[in-house]
């Protein structure tokens, strides 16, 4: 379970970090256009 949890957290961060970055970029461009 420990290795599974560690891998799950690593995968989650690997997916969430770029996703949040893209969301922030998208919101930033929307605000600039409006």
From Swiss-Prot:
Q: Which GO terms describe its biological process?
A: photosynthesis, light reaction
| GO terms for cellular component | photosystem II; plasma membrane-derived thylakoid membrane
UniProt xrefs under SUPFAM superfamilies:
Photosystem II reaction center protein M, PsbM
Q: Which UniProt keywords apply?
A: Membrane, Photosynthesis, Photosystem II, Reaction center, Thylakoid, Transmembrane, Transmembrane helix
| Functional summary from the UniProt entry | One of the components of the core complex of photosystem II (PSII). PSII is a light-driven water:plastoquinone oxidoreductase that uses light energy to abstract electrons from H(2)O, generating O(2) and a proton gradient subsequently used for ATP formation. It consists of a core antenna complex that captures photons, and an electron transfer chain that converts photonic excitation into a charge separation. This subunit is found at the monomer-monomer interface.
Q: Which family, according to UniProt?
A: Belongs to the PsbM family.
Q: What is this protein called?
A: Photosystem II reaction center protein M
Q: What is the protein's species of origin?
A: Synechococcus sp. (strain CC9605)
Gene this chain is encoded by: psbM
